[in-house]
From Swiss-Prot:
Classification via NCBIfam families: DnaA, PRK14086.1
Organism: Clostridium perfringens (strain SM101 / Type A)
Region (Domain III, AAA+ region): 119-335
Name this polypeptide is given: Chromosomal replication initiator protein DnaA
Oligomer status and interactors: Oligomerizes as a right-handed, spiral filament on DNA at oriC.
Annotated ATP binding sites: 163, 165-167
Family membership noted in the UniProt record: Belongs to the DnaA family.
Bias (Basic and acidic residues): 91-103
UniProt note: domains: Domain I is involved in oligomerization and binding regulators, domain II is flexibile and of varying length in different bacteria, domain III forms the AAA+ region, while domain IV binds dsDNA.
Pfam families to which the protein is assigned, alphabetical: Bac_DnaA (PF00308), Bac_DnaA_C (PF08299), DnaA_N (PF11638)
Region of interest (Domain II), residue spans: 75-118
C-alpha cells in the first residue's frame, strides 16, 4: 500500500469509527485492506464472501461518504476476495515464468523463493499458532525442522483431521526458514496443484522445467499428500522428486489427513519413504486449547468477547479450530446485525443451527456397540457373547474403552452391557487399549474415526 493510499484510508477509518459501534468497526471495516485507487474507484480486499456481502449491503454507502469527506470526490467501491486476488497473482506469476522460459540459465534452474513465499499465508506463523496438548508434539517437530532443515527429521509427516492446524504449521515452517535465510528456495504446494502442473507439463512437453522447479529447491512442502494416492503418474514423478531431494539433503515436509499406512492405494515404495523421518499427529483441541484459540482470535481481530461466551463456544464446539473461529465470527456478526451486546443468550441464538446438529443424539453404550460392530463387520450379539477369539475379543475391548471414555456409565454397568462381564474386565480392556494407542497409529486413526462419527451424529 503506497503512502498516499494509506493516508487516505486512515482518514476514512477515523471518520467511520465515529459512526458505528466498536464491534461493527472491528468486525467489518477493519477486515478491509485497500488495494488501489484510480479513476475514482477504490478497490478493497476482503477475507470471505460473507464479509463481502455484509460490506456491500450495509457499509458501502458509509465508506463512500467517508471518502467524500476526506477527498471532496465521490468514489465507487469495489470489493475483491483475498482468495481471488491470490489466484490472480499466481496466474500473473505463471505468465511471467512462461515468458522467461527462453531466457533461463543453461541448466534450467529457476529462483523460486520470492515467487513461492507469496503463496505462504502471512497469518500462519509459529507466533500465531496456539499450542496445546493436542498439537504440542507436531508443533515441536515443525519448529525443530524449521530451525535445522534436513538435519532434524526428514521427511516430516504431519497428519490430522480437517481444520486442526496442519496447513498452519507448514506455512509457519516456510516463513521461519525464509526469515532465517531469505535466499533459501522454499516451495509450498498442494498435492492437487502438483498433479495439475505435472499434467500440464506432460501436455506441453515441459517435463524438464517441471522437474527443475521441484527438484532444485531447499525445502519442499506438500499439503494433502494423500490425494496423490491412486494417481500412478503423479506417484511415479513424486517418487523420483522425493529421492532427488533426499539424496541432496534437502528438507521435505508433507501433510495428510491420515498416517502413511492408512492411505489407500498409495504405492509401498512411497509409503516407506514417508515413514523414513518423523510422523507427528494433531488431535482435536482439548477445552483449554479451545479457549486459548478463541482468546487469540479475539485479540488478533480486536474483538471484545465476554469470557463466559468463550466458555460457551469452547464447550459446544469441539471438533476443530476452523469451526471454533467460525462460531466466534458468527456470534460477532449476529451481534452487529441485530445491534445487541454479545452474551451467552445471543451466542445460543447465533449458533442454534450448528449446536442442535452436534447435540442431536447422546453417545450411549448401545450406539458405541453399533459403531464398533459395524466397523468390524460384526453383530452386536458378538460383542456381548462369551466368545474370545481375537476377531471378536479385540473389538469388544475397543467398545469397552470407548464406553468408559465417552459415557458416564459406571464400570459395573458397562460390564453388564457386554454380556454381564465383571467391572475388572472393563478396566483391563480400557488399560490395554490405552497402552496400545501409544504406539499403534492404525488404532489411533480408527478410534478417532469412530469417536468423530459418534460425537457428530
Amino acid at each position: 500500500m503506497d503512502a498516499q493510499l494509506n493516508n487516505l484510508w486512515e482518514q476514512a477509518l477515523n471518520i467511520i469509527k465515529g459512526e458505528i459501534s466498536e464491534i461493527s468497526f472491528n468486525t467489518w471495516i477493519k477486515s478491509c485492506t485497500p488495494i488501489s485507487i484510480s479513476d475514482n474507484i477504490l478497490k478493497l480486499s476482503v477475507p470471505n464472501e460473507f464479509t463481502k456481502g455484509i460490506l456491500d449491503t450495509r457499509y458501502k454507502d458509509l465508506l463512500i461518504q467517508a471518502l467524500k469527506i476526506v477527498t471532496s470526490r465521490k468514489f465507487k467501491i469495489e470489493f475483491y476476495l483475498e482468495s481471488d486476488l491470490e489466484e490472480e497473482k499466481e496466474n500473473e506469476e505463471k505468465q511471467k515464468e512462461e515468458k522467461k522460459d527462453n531466457t533461463n540459465d543453461v541448466d534450467g534452474s529457476i529462483v523460486v523463493s520470492d515467487e513461492m513465499s507469496a503463496t505462504l499465508n502471512p497469518k500462519y506463523t509459529f507466533q500465531s499458532f496456539v499450542i496445546g496438548n493436542s498439537n504440542r508434539f507436531a508443533h515441536a517437530a515443525s519448529l525443530a525442522v524449521a530451525e535445522s532443515p534436513a538435519k532434524a527429521y526428514n521427511p516430516l509427516f504431519i497428519y490430522g483431521g480437517v481444520g486442526l492446524g496442519k496447513t498452519h504449521l507448514m506455512h509457519a515452517i516456510g516463513h521461519y526458514i525464509l526469515q532465517e535465510n531469505p535466499k533459501a528456495k522454499v516451495v509450498y504446494v498442494s498435492s492437487e496443484k502438483f498433479t495439475n502442473e505435472l499434467i500440464n507439463a506432460i501436455k506441453d512437453d515441459k517435463n524438464e522445467e517441471f522437474r527443475n522447479k521441484y527438484r532444485k529447491v531447499d525445502v519442499l512442502l506438500i499439503d494433502d499428500i494423500q490425494f496423490i494416492a491412486g494417481k500412478e503418474r503423479t506417484q511415479e514423478e513424486f517418487f523420483h522428486t522425493f529421492n532427488a531431494l533426499h539424496e541432496e539433503n534437502k528438507q521435505i515436509i508433507l501433510s495428510s489427513d491420515r498416517p502413511p499406512k492408512e492411505i489407500p492405494t498409495l504405492e509401498d515404495r512411497l509409503r516407506s519413504r514417508f515413514e523414513w523421518g518423523l510422523i507427528a499427529d494433531i488431535q482435536p483441541p482439548d477445552f483449554e486449547t479451545r479457549m486459548a484459540i478463541l482468546k487469540k482470535k479475539a485479540d488478533v481481530e480486536g474483538l471484545s468477547v465476554p469470557n463466559e461466551v468463550m466458555v460457551y463456544i469452547a464447550t459446544k464446539i469441539k471438533s476443530n479450530i476452523r469451526e471454533l473461529e467460525g462460531a466466534l465470527i458468527r456470534i460477532i456478526a449476529y451481534s452487529s446485525l441485530t445491534n445487541r451486546d454479545v452474551s451467552v443468550d445471543l451466542a445460543s441464538e447465533a449458533l442454534k443451527d450448528i449446536i442442535s446438529n452436534k447435540e442431536s443424539a447422546p453417545v450411549t453404550v448401545k450406539t458405541i456397540q453399533e459403531s464398533v460392530a459395524n466397523y468390524y463387520n460384526l453383530r452386536i450379539e458378538d460383542l456381548k457373547s462369551q466368545r474370545r477369539t481375537r476377531n471378536i475379543a479385540y473389538p469388544r475391548q475397543i467398545a469397552m474403552y470407548l464406553s468408559r471414555k465417552l459415557t458416564d456409565m459406571s464400570l459395573p454397568k458397562i460390564g453388564e452391557e457386554f454380556g454381564g462381564r465383571d467391572h475388572t474386565t472393563v478396566i483391563h480392556a480400557y488399560e490395554k487399549i490405552s497402552e496400545n494407542l501409544k504406539t499403534d497409529e492404525g488404532l489411533q486413526s480408527m478410534i478417532n474415526d469412530i469417536t468423530k462419527k459418534l460425537t457428530q451424529k
